[in-house]
């Protein structure tokens, strides 16, 4: 039965971003050449060796070439590089993780490189020769499985101030991964009494229960999550129905344990930390935050518990907070909740709080003109929260979060 219900793992924010990139930019694989002159925007990957103090390392050189159309002359840009593992097909991309935090997505360990590219000199510019935009050491990349992997690299140019995408291209590249992948590590773990998905459900239920009771909105969200997981992994038919039935049964068990006061949240998080891959752990954290967000309220004891759970799962605090900003309600008026969402620590003095709020303001203000409507809406909500925090917290000598 565990073989039937184990579902395809998706890295909540990271994979969504990679899949969105693949969806927005289909068919932009390379460019075309007419009369020896390249038209369109293109990218490619070149393997090479880079010397180091200790010898050398294998790297992947990412290059771009071709036509770039900007809104105006001297339009300042950033370059972004994303990588997806499409060995199972472009309709089933899996995230490529990165061990270097500088090249990770804001809210997950999935690879994402963003660097300043500089101004585009004219509205229409053509790179006649290949230009290198990044060199990625192979050793920092973590793939789903060992062996030959088919990778999709997506290179895009975005406005530095407004986030507008002005050029994009993708290319496919085969890479042989000699090390176990993050899903291989999951498969070789000792057999668990419950599959990873059961532990995820127990963790979310345990965090959200109040005196043994889970709000109906949370239970509904968890049941929808079960169906979604099965639909992503299993073709329609008896096996999918069996997987849904199995996981719903385990959720009912978790609800009974919560009612009896016997649902061990910390112990469940520790089991996930031991048995689950990093992808599973981020997915578990994302499910917990979605469940808490479904309540439309974040209570003080729960924010403490959330940070403790993140620590037990081995998730970076700042990445967890970025995930929380996407999932948790923004209409809070509690000082404790504002501090949690905006990264204000009790030990900060007034100057440090103002600096933290300024950093958050700069980050979100840069997104108010983003081409993605969902990001614009989130930016508006965050800026409203920051304004309230400034009026209530910035000049206080201390902030008591209790």
Where are the regions that the model predicts?
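Small-residue-enriched hydrophobic alpha-helices in membranes
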Residues: 2-209, 213-402
């Amino acid at each position: 039965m565990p073989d039937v219900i184990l579902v395809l793992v998706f890295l909540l924010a990271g994979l969504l971003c990679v899949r969105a990139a693949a969806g927005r930019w289909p068919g932009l694989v390379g460019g075309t050449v007419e009369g020896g002159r390249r038209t369109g925007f293109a990218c490619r990957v070149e393997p090479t060796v880079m010397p180091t103090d200790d010898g050398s390392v294998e790297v992947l050189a990412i290059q771009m070439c071709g036509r770039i159309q900007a809104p105006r002359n001297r339009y300042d840009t950033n370059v972004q590089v994303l990588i997806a593992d499409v060995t199972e097909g472009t309709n089933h991309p899996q995230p490529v993780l990165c061990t270097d935090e500088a090249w990770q997505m804001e809210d997950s360990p999935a690879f994402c490189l963003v660097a300043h590219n500089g101004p585009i000199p004219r509205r229409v510019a053509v790179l006649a020769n290949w230009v290198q935009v990044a060199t990625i050491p192979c050793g920092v990349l973590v793939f789903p499985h060992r062996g030959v992997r088919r990778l999709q690299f997506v290179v895009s140019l975005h406005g530095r101030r407004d986030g507008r995408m002005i050029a994009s291209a993708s290319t496919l590249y085969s890479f042989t991964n000699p090390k176990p992948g993050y899903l291989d590590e999951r498969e070789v773990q000792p057999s668990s009494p419950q599959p990873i998905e059961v532990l995820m459900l127990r963790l979310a239920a345990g965090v959200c229960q109040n005196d043994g009771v889970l709000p109906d909105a949370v239970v509904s969200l968890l049941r929808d999550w079960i169906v979604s997981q099965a639909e992503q992994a299993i073709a329609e038919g008896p096996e999918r129905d069996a997987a849904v039935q199995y996981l719903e049964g385990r959720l009912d068990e978790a609800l009974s344990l919560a009612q009896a006061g016997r649902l061990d949240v910390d112990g469940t998080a520790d089991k996930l930390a031991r048995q689950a891959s990093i992808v599973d752990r981020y997915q578990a954290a994302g499910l917990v935050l979605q469940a808490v967000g479904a309540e439309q309220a974040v209570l003080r004891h729960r924010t403490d518990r959330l940070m403790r759970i993140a620590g037990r799962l081995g998730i970076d605090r700042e990445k967890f907070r970025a995930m929380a900003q996407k999932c948790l309600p923004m209409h809070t008026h509690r000082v404790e909740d504002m501090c949690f969402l905006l990264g204000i620590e009790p030990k900060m003095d007034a100057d440090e709080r103002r600096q933290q709020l300024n950093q958050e303001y700069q980050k979100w203000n840069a997104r108010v003109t983003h081409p993605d409507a969902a990001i614009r809406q989130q930016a508006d909500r965050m800026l409203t929260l920051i304004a309230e925090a400034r009026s209530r917290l910035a000049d206080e000598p201390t902030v008591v979060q209790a």
